[in-house]
Amino acid sequence: MFYIHLENTFDLSSTILVKLPEAYAIFDPIVDVMPIIPLFFFLLAFVWQASVSFR
């Protein structure tokens, strides 16, 4: 069962590294930045709490 889990993980990681189809090539820079967007929300939470003095 553990082997199957590892096999699926490798399949997922190889799919993430696939290039976009040619029709969507213009969105490639946006797609490169998209995984970072949740980090901005995480940092925004700290800025928000700092502005209200970490109540």
Curated annotation (Swiss-Prot):
Keywords: Chloroplast, Membrane, Photosynthesis, Photosystem II, Plastid, Reaction center, Thylakoid, Transmembrane, Transmembrane helix. Its main location: plastid. The chain crosses the membrane at residues 26-46. Pfam families: PsbK. Residues 1-18 form a propeptide. It is found in: Plastid, Chloroplast thylakoid membrane. GO terms for biological process: photosynthesis. GO terms for cellular component: chloroplast thylakoid membrane; photosystem II reaction center. SUPFAM superfamilies: Photosystem II reaction center protein K, PsbK. It comes from the Eukaryota. Belongs to the PsbK family. PANTHER family: PHOTOSYSTEM II REACTION CENTER PROTEIN K, PTHR35325. One of the components of the core complex of photosystem II (PSII). PSII is a light-driven water:plastoquinone oxidoreductase that uses light energy to abstract electrons from H(2)O, generating O(2) and a proton gradient subsequently used for ATP formation. It consists of a core antenna complex that captures photons, and an electron transfer chain that converts photonic excitation into a charge separation. PSII is composed of 1 copy each of membrane proteins PsbA, PsbB, PsbC, PsbD, PsbE, PsbF, PsbH, PsbI, PsbJ, PsbK, PsbL, PsbM, PsbT, PsbX, PsbY, PsbZ, Psb30/Ycf12, at least 3 peripheral proteins of the oxygen-evolving complex and a large number of cofactors. It forms dimeric complexes. This is Photosystem II reaction center protein K. It comes from Anthoceros angustus.
